[in-house]
Regions:
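Bacterial N-terminal signal peptides that target proteins for export
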Residues: 1-7
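N-terminal signal peptide c-region/cleavage motif recognized by signal peptidases
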Residues: 15-17
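Lipid deacylating catalytic domains
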Residues: 21-269
Length: 269
């Protein structure tokens, strides 16, 4: 009986922690703002949830860092973060294998070329294979699973209150297509991270200048130009494309501020 009681206490504490943050009872906040995180193709369901948790952690840390804590309302502290998952598809893995098998021994020169360093010649193997790869590249990034897309649409349409999407990599195609299919009054604002698309969504975008993946496919997909310095740590993320390892590490505060300002625009006097 004692063991059962202890387990019950643990469960209740765990449940309570889902609704209370920094002494704020979020159950009293009606329809709290919602951030949907849409993962890229390399992230399975569990990885997407870990990134969602990191995004949430970064946001709350940013709130705690604000010098004027009297400005921080209960609603700000009760923003909820939900994953809008899409499947990890084989075309992406196949594409990476093609690149890895083709990269010459001098990988430094290869990535210098990918980063468009002046004076570095396009590798012959890539120039010869480029046309053959175009179809694979586009299909790998633009591939959309209908069941996943419908789930996204249902999530967005069924959520009350303020909403926004943070989409990473190929997840931007899902966010864009969901808004195409949603009625105008239910469309959801999107902030794009490492987007392979060529059009900026309503809340803008963030792409690092050292993102090897986006740099590699820009000529094919028409991806938007880089607009931030990444300062990638390649031992943690050799592609410099990871949401958690690269983008939240380098620009977590910027992303958190973007969330806050989207839901609670600063008042200008």
């Amino acid at each position: 009986m004692k063991t059962f009681s202890l387990c019950l206490v643990v469960v209740l504490l765990g449940t309570t922690s889902m609704f209370v943050y920094a002494d704020v009872d979020c159950s009293s906040v009606t329809n709290p703002p919602t951030v949907f995180f849409v993962n890229g193709m390399r992230d399975d369901k569990f990885a997407a949830e870990r990134i969602r948790d990191k995004l949430k952690e970064v946001y709350y840390s940013y709130l705690d860092s604000l010098p004027n804590q009297s400005y921080v309302t209960d609603e700000m502290r009760c923003v909820q973060f939900l994953p809008a998952h899409n499947q990890n598809e084989e075309p992406w893995n196949e594409l990476l294998e093609v690149f890895l098998q083709s990269i010459p021994d001098d990988t430094v020169a290869f990535w210098q070329w990918i980063d468009l360093i002046p004076g570095v010649t396009v590798p012959e193997w890539f120039r010869n294979a480029q046309l053959a790869l175009e179809e694979t590249i586009v299909s790998a990034f633009a591939y959309i699973v209908d069941e996943d897309l419908q789930q996204h649409i249902d999530q967005y349409a069924g959520t009350l209150g303020k909403r926004m999407v943070i989409a990473h990599s190929q997840g931007n195609f899902y966010a864009t297509q969901a808004n195409v299919l949603l009625p105008p009054d239910l469309r959801i604002p999107v902030f794009a991270v490492a987007t392979p698309e060529g059009i900026s969504p309503s809340l803008g975008y963030l792409t690092h200048d050292d993102d090897h993946v986006i740099n590699a496919i820009r000529l094919v997909t028409g991806a938007l130009p880089a607009n931030a310095a990444g300062e990638c740590v390649e031992k943690d993320d050799w592609t410099c494309h990871g949401m958690k390892e690269s983008y939240l590490r380098a620009n977590g505060e910027y992303i958190a501020r973007h969330i806050l300002n989207t839901f609670f625009p600063p008042v200008l006097y």
